[in-house]
Design a protein with these regions (language model features):
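Transmembrane beta-barrel architecture of outer-membrane proteins
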Residues: 59-61, 124-126, 173, 218, ...
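Small/polar, glycine/serine/threonine/aspartate-rich low-complexity segments that form flexible
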Residues: 38-41, 45-54, 103-131, 254-272, ...
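Short, acidic/charged, Gly/Pro-enriched secondary-structure junctions
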Residues: 74-92, 101-105, 294
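Terminal intrinsically disordered/low-complexity segments used for targeting and assembly
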Residues: 2-68, 150, 234-281, 287, ...
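Sec/SRP-type N-terminal targeting helices
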Residues: 74-75, 91, 136-164, 214, ...
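Membrane-embedded beta-strand positions in outer-membrane beta-barrel channels/transporters
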Residues: 63, 126-128, 175, 220, ...
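Short segments within alpha-helical structural elements
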Residues: 192, 196-200, 225-253, 303, ...
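Periplasmic alpha-helical coiled-coil/stalk elements that build and connect Gram-negative outer-membrane
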Residues: 142, 158-275, 386, 410, ...
Length: 469
């Protein structure tokens, strides 16, 4: 085999050897387990996707609509397409290109520049294949840049998964807030009707001399209080509806949303968080931060390779002739092969500065990665604390609401039987309304906290991340 061919094969075999440091994942700066009793309850988050987590079919449908139509999410998903295209562009540099080329040239040479002393007109025509400049990646510069582009693409993809999970959580929480506002509004309407009935009864008793003006004013005050609370709850319901409509992103979003509160006590289910090590492997923002760290690690390889020679090849093969008609005549074959070697000798410290910059950027990415883990750990711990305490609070408030409801029934019977005063009955009405409202609020907050936990754990997203066109 010819020596030039052997040298070329050796160069190609060495191409792509990376000078990037061996990547090692930093140790997670968090504890190895969760310090919460709630960590042992519910289905494991690693086995739970959002369709299973959401029990209510209406809410599942709304989340699906939002995933298909939300504008902010669509923009995020299109960022994936940009990152994927950028990676493909960078990856193409690792493969020699080939293009067809044809050119013609016709020029006049003045007599004072001609060997014959007379002006002359010359022509040349060429057609063939051309090899654009191709770098032999002996020291892994192009490979490192390609690896960095790949990690940036994977980071963008993970960030998009995080955006999808965030949207699922936002829609779920907006829906839970809306459902809670509906339930409070329904309770207020029932309470107002009951208090208006009581006011009518007292008005009759007052006309008969069996009730005082004070009794009437007390009852009237409760009616006006209920009317004010009715407007407040109606406003909260409408605001929650507006937030949900915005998240859904469709013109007919309001028509898709149920107009009556759900009769199920729980619209979502309990989940168990698993271990912090599982969180690192599952949560998208942690994965995105690690991909950025890997990209910065690859950048060091590219910066190191800049200190070494760079060899590039260009060439062409085809036919040439002074006449266009002679391009394909025998003997018109032509070729060129132009290897180029570039070796940095003096660059005023540019390459050293680039290497220092790459190392500092990697250190910064390590700090960002560790900070992301700590933030995720804190969010999970906060969500576990909230779900644990709210679960017990919800049970206590349900028991309290049941008790005050029975008290109201007894107080009403005793008042109508003339055994107790009207004031005792009004106090029972007021106490029952306050405790029923508190139970609804706590129940809503508990489910919202479960959604926070679901998001903090990475959401159990199992679908492919693709842009909706």
């Amino acid at each position: 085999m010819h020596k030039p061919a052997c040298a070329l094969l050796l160069a190609l075999s060495l191409a792509g050897c990376s000078m990037a440091p061996t990547y090692e994942r930093p140790e997670a700066p968090v504890a190895s387990s969760w310090n919460s009793p709630a960590a042992k309850t519910g289905q494991a988050a690693s086995n739970l996707d959002w369709q299973t987590f959401i029990v209510d079919s209406e809410l599942r449908n709304l989340v699906g609509v939002a995933l298909d139509n939300n504008r902010s999410l669509r923009q995020t998903l299109l960022d994936i397409e940009q990152a994927r295209a950028q990676y493909r562009i960078q990856r193409a540099d690792r493969v020699p290109g080939l293009s067809a080329a044809a050119n013609g040239n016709r020029q006049r040479l003045p007599g004072d520049l001609s060997n014959t002393g007379s002006s002359a007109v010359s022509s040349s025509y060429q057609v063939g294949l051309a090899l654009p400049e191709y770098e032999l990646d002996l020291f892994g510069r192009v490979k490192s840049l390609t690896d960095a582009a790949l990690e940036q693409y994977l980071s963008t993809e993970a960030a998009a998964r995080s955006a999808q999970i965030a949207l699922i959580a936002e829609v779920s929480q907006a829906y839970l807030t809306y459902d809670g506002a509906q339930r409070r509004l329904q309770l207020t309407e029932q309470t107002l009707a009951s208090r208006e009935d009581s006011l009518g009864l007292i008005s009759q008793r007052r006309s008969a001399g069996a009730a005082t003006a004070l009794d009437y004013q007390e009852a009237l005050g409760l009616v006006e209080q209920s009317r004010a609370e009715l407007e407040s709850n109606a406003r909260q319901k409408q605001q929650a509806l507006n937030a949900l409509v915005l998240l859904l992103g469709t013109a007919d979003a309001a028509k898709r949303i149920p107009q009556l509160p759900q009769d199920k006590p729980m619209l979502i289910q309990d989940i168990a968080p698993g271990t912090p090590s599982e969180l690192i492997e599952r949560r998208p923002d942690i994965l995105a931060a690690e991909h950025v760290l890997k990209a910065r690690n690859a950048d060091i390889g590219a910066a190191r390779a800049a200190f070494f020679p760079r060899i590039s090849l260009t060439g062409s093969f085809g036919t040439s002739s002074a006449e266009m008609s002679g391009l394909f005549d025998g003997g018109s074959r032509s070729w060129s092969f132009v290897p180029t070697l570039s070796l940095p000798i003096f660059d005023a410290g540019r390459n050293s500065a680039n290497l220092d910059l790459a190392k500092v950027r990697k250190d910064s990415a390590v700090a960002a990665y560790e900070g992301t883990i700590q933030t995720a750990f804190r969010e999970v711990a906060d969500a576990l604390a909230a779900t644990d305490t709210l679960r017990r609070e919800e049970a206590a408030r349900r028991a309290l609401a049941n008790t005050t409801n029975e008290t109201l029934k007894l107080a009403k019977a005793r008042y109508e039987g003339g055994v107790d005063s009207h004031l005792r009955y009004l106090d029972a009405q007021r106490s029952n309304f306050v405790n029923e409202s508190a139970y609804i609020e706590t129940s809503t907050q508990r489910q919202i906290a479960l959604v926070d936990l679901f998001r903090a754990l990475g959401g159990g997203w199992s679908g492919e991340v693709t842009a909706q066109r």
